[in-house]
C-alpha cells in the first residue's frame, strides 16, 4: 500500500525548471505573433471609424449644397483676418445645431489687431466644444489646445482641434493662397456650385485628413507632421491670378519646411478658424511628405499644408460625390494634384 502511494506521488511530480521555461517561451512566442495581428485589427477599426467620421462631414457638405444651392464658403475680410471655416458652416448638418447656436456669426471668430489676433470672447463657448466627428481616432494627439490663439501665444482659452481639412487648392502656381479664388471648391468667400465642378464630383476632392499639432514650439529639430515651419515669403505669394507663376519644386518645398526659422505645433488647433493653417489642405504633394509643412507670416492665409495621417501608407479623403477613399503615399503626384481641382480637365483615371 505504501509502495503504491509512493509510486502515485512519483507520477504526480510538478514541472521541471526546463519544462517551465519551455512553456513560458512558447507563450511568449504566441504573444509575439498575436500582438501585431491585434494591433493591425485595432488600426483597421480606427481607420474605418476615421472614414466614417469623414463621410459624415461629406454628407453634411452635400446637404448644405442641396439646401442652399452652393457649397459652404470660408468667410473672410481684411478687417477680420480670419473668417469662419467650412467645418463651422456645416455644424447644423452634422447634428451639432446646439453648438452652432453658440456662434455669433455677426461677429468675427477673432478680435485684436493684425498680427496679434485672439479668439473673440463672444465665440469662446463654441470654440471650446469638441466635435468628435472632426477627429481621427488614430491620431492620438490631444485635440484640446490651450497654448494658441492665432499667432502662437496663448492666454489659456480652450480651442478644440480638427483632423479633417477642406481642400483649398491644388497648390500649383499660386493656387495655395486661399485668400483669393483657387482651383478648388473651397477658398475665402467662395460660392461654388455643382455646375462649376466640370471635372466631375467623383474626380474632385472636398476634404483630406491631416495630423494635429503637438502643442509645442521649437526653433530646431521639428516633428514632421506635427509642427509647421514659419518661412516668411513663399514663392508666388501676393501674386494670385498672375500668369507665369510656377509651382515650387519639391526641393523648394523641402527647403521651406526644413529651413524655417521657427516651428509651431498649432496645426489644426481649431475647427472654427477659416485659415489654411487650421482647417485647410493642398493636394500639391501626395500624403505624408517627409518634411514639415510651411507657412508664410502669421497674418496671412497661405502656406503649404499637406495631407497627413497616423494610418500606415496613406490618408483618407472625401470626394464631392460623397465617397470616402484611402489615398496612398505612392499615388502619382499629378493625379493627386488633379484631384484638388474642380475644373482642370485633367485625366485622373489612376485613382482606383
Annotate each language-model stretch with its function.
Residues 1-17:
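N-terminal leader/signal peptides at the extreme start of proteins
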Residues 12-46, 56:
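N-terminal single-pass transmembrane signal-anchor helix
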Residues 40-352:
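Internal low-complexity, small-residue/proline-rich segments
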Amino acid at each position: 500500500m505504501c509502495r503504491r502511494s509512493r509510486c502515485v506521488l512519483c507520477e504526480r511530480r510538478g514541472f521541471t525548471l526546463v519544462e517551465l521555461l519551455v512553456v513560458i517561451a512558447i507563450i511568449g512566442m504566441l504573444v509575439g505573433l498575436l500582438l501585431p495581428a491585434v494591433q493591425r485589427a485595432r488600426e483597421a477599426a480606427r481607420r474605418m471609424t476615421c472614414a466614417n467620421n469623414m463621410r459624415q462631414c461629406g454628407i453634411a457638405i452635400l446637404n448644405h449644397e442641396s439646401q442652399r444651392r452652393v457649397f459652404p464658403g470660408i468667410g473672410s475680410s481684411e478687417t477680420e483676418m480670419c473668417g469662419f471655416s467650412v467645418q463651422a458652416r456645416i455644424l447644423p448638418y452634422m447634428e451639432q445645431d446646439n453648438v452652432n447656436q453658440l456662434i455669433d456669426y455677426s461677429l468675427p471668430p477673432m478680435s485684436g489687431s493684425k498680427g496679434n489676433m485672439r479668439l473673440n470672447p463672444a465665440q469662446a463657448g463654441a470654440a471650446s466644444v469638441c466635435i468628435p466627428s472632426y477627429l481621427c481616432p488614430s491620431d492620438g494627439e490631444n485635440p484640446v489646445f490651450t497654448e494658441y490663439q492665432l499667432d502662437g501665444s496663448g492666454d489659456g482659452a480652450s480651442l478644440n482641434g480638427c483632423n479633417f481639412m477642406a481642400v483649398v487648392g491644388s497648390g500649383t502656381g499660386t493656387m495655395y493662397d486661399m485668400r483669393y479664388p483657387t482651383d478648388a471648391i473651397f477658398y475665402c468667400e467662395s460660392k461654388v456650385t455643382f455646375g462649376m465642378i466640370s471635372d466631375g464630383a467623383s474626380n474632385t476632392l472636398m476634404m483630406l485628413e491631416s495630423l494635429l499639432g503637438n502643442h509645442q514650439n521649437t526653433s530646431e529639430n521639428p516633428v514632421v507632421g506635427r509642427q509647421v515651419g514659419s518661412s516668411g515669403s513663399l514663392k508666388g505669394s501676393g501674386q494670385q491670378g498672375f500668369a507665369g507663376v510656377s509651382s515650387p519644386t519639391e526641393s523648394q518645398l523641402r527647403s521651406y519646411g526644413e529651413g524655417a526659422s521657427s516651428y509651431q505645433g498649432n496645426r489644426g488647433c481649431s475647427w472654427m478658424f477659416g485659415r489654411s493653417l487650421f482647417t485647410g489642405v493642398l493636394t500639391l504633394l501626395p500624403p505624408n511628405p517627409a518634411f514639415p509643412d510651411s507657412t508664410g507670416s502669421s497674418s496671412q492665409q497661405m502656406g503649404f499644408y499637406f495631407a497627413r495621417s497616423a494610418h500606415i501608407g496613406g490618408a483618407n479623403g472625401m470626394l464631392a460625390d460623397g465617397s470616402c477613399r484611402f489615398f496612398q503615399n505612392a499615388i502619382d503626384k499629378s493625379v493627386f494634384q488633379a484631384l484638388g481641382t474642380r475644373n482642370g480637365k485633367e485625366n485622373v483615371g489612376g485613382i482606383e
